[in-house]
Amino acid sequence: MDVIRPIEPAASNRHRFILVAIDYFTKWVEAASYKSVTKKVVADFVRNNLICRFGVLEPIITDNGANLNNHLMKEICEQFKIINRKSTAYRPQMNGAVEAANKNIKKILRKMIDKHRGWHKMFPYALLGYRTTVRTSTGVTPYLLVYGTEAVIPVEVEIPSLRIIQEAELSNAEWVSKRIDQVALIVEKRMVAVCHGQLYRQRMTRAFHKRVRARNFEVGQLVLKRIFPHQDEYKGKFVPNWQGPYMVCKVLSGGALVLSQMDGIVWPKPINSDAVKRYYV
């Protein structure tokens, strides 16, 4: 779950933010636009748009934003026994599925709107377009993996497709029988998507390892931490963008590090190893 923020200019209804959640397997996206993403807005979105529609979630992965991690979210997670996992700080790739969905939603909206302040009117159609488009990682549409059949999109109403023409000739009993067959095959379709996704991840992993060299750190080493442009410590392009030194006090799987200041105070949030570099005295 993540927030697209802020959209300028704001929509005519003054909405400037889009709260987005994606299912990692089906790639189904739930999203809604708001004037501001407050703690209550996030809690209501999780309860109304996710839990009440799709059932209790097992984990929810968010970034470290204060509006996505608050006492209201904690209460909902405790009430429904949901695990709330946080991605590594300053590392959008750790929540890559929703970041990719954000990019695609913005790209679809950009192509659909004529007046920038009217994007909220086209937003539901952008979601429909995303849900009915084949995703590279699964080989099928999110709509198919959720409902077991493809959606009837608006263009098929104007220009009937072969599927629509064939279904129009079916009797009610034949249509029901066909729908039952589609639902019966949904498990098989999902297993095919699982296999496709595994092969896709293997290809992406091989491509990543070919061009990226692993950086190994050990406990006790001194490092410098990168200052990112959105941080308060950032002073401009011509000022050093590293701060420290810090000490590595724990090495986590996946390349994340837990750092501590030189006075022994441990940072509460891990940071990815590509945001630090060795410090030599």
What is each PLM-predicted segment?
Residues 1-189, 193-281:
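Integrase module of LTR retroelements
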